[in-house]
Structure formats: C-alpha cells, structure tokens
Amino acid sequence: MNFPAPFAYPSKPHVRRHGPLGYSKYGQYRNWLRDEFTFRCVYCLRRETWLTLRRDYELDHFLPKSEHPDVERDYDNLVYACSECNGTKAAKYLPSPESVAYGKCLRVDENGKIQALNEHGMTIIEVLRLDAPEYNRLRYQIIETVAGLQSRPRVLELWLGYPDNLPNLSAEKKPKDNKRPQGIRESHYERKLRDELPEYY
C-alpha cells in the first residue's frame, strides 16, 4: 500500500466546500474550517494529530482584519492555520490557496527541506520562514517517523489518520444561512458515517 506523503501540498487550488454565513463571532466558524482544511495548517501542513492542544490552531484572516474590517466575519476570508504560521504571517499578504495551487509553488524533499517552485513559493517561504532550520528538522523527523511505521498500520494511523473528534456540522449552532449547504454531506464526519473516509490522508 502506498501511504500519503505527510508534506504533500495540494496540486490544485482549494475550492471551498462550506459556506456558513451570519455568525456574530468569527471563532464560531472553527469546526467548519477544521473540516474545510482537513484538520491541518493550510501553510505548513502540520496536522492536529501532531499537536495536542486546541490553542495550537487558530483562524487566520487571509486579508488582515486590521485593514479589511468588513470581512472579519466572512467565512471565505478565514483559513485554518497553526498558531506559529498565523503569528508569523500577521498582517502580511500571501498568495491565496484558492487562487494558486500550493503544490505548484512548494515542494518538500525527503530530507525535510522545502523548495520554492516559482515566485509564489518564494514569497510563502520568505513570509512564513518555512525554510528555518527548526522547520526542516521537524519535517525530516516526521518524514522519517512515518517511513519507519509503514509496517505498523495501526500506529501509522495515529500520524496520517483523521482526528477522533471529527465535527458533526449538522449539530453546530445553525448559521443564519449557508451558501454551500451541500458541503455538509461531504464533510469528513458524514463520509465516515457512510464508510467513505480513507484510513490515511
């Protein structure tokens, strides 16, 4: 069986699956965004299952709310990010993962080093400092750990599987509206109920 690479960026631009509208606080979109971005940081690809504390992940305003207060609670301006990437990005601008495929911009080699494939990739790496030695080391440690676990699928699932607490979006506080209601059926929770969710991603 071929297992997914832990640091493979998406080969296509992200297409929003969900579209809840009308929450009074942007934090209420958290579980929608967890599902939207597959429980990992959109920038560095670190997964929830690799970090243990809820506060390790935040909701990043892609267009900074300090400069664009009108979209502070706009779901389509929010992405799921680890606290380190969110803090480093701050109010800086990056190529949108919905406009460009990050997999066409960035590549992580087997030694954990990240490479820019174009100018967008150079910008992402520079702004987020993704080529810092500690990032390279962390990626290498995880790549080697995953490689060493390929004969132990149950343990490997802890690293490459989905988190246990998949959000049931139908049970979330109902938003005022949802411009993509069909996305709930395609959520990871619903797919698991239908036995359509793969073991690894």
Over which residues does each language-model region extend?
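Short, charged surface segments at domain edges that flank catalytic/cofactor-binding sites
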Residues: 2-43, 68-73
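Short, Lys/Arg-enriched charge-dense amphipathic segments
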Residues: 72-84, 112-123
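Alpha-helical interaction segments
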Residues: 13-19, 52, 96, 149, ...
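Short amphipathic alpha-helical surface micro-motifs
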Residues: 24, 39-44, 61-62, 85-90, ...
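Short cysteine-rich loop/turn motifs with clustered Cys
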Residues: 29-56, 82-85
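C-terminal, charged low-complexity interaction regions
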Residues: 132-201
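Conserved, surface-exposed functional patches that form binding/active-site neighborhoods
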Residues: 89-161
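Histidine-centered nuclease catalytic patch
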Residues: 46-80, 92-107
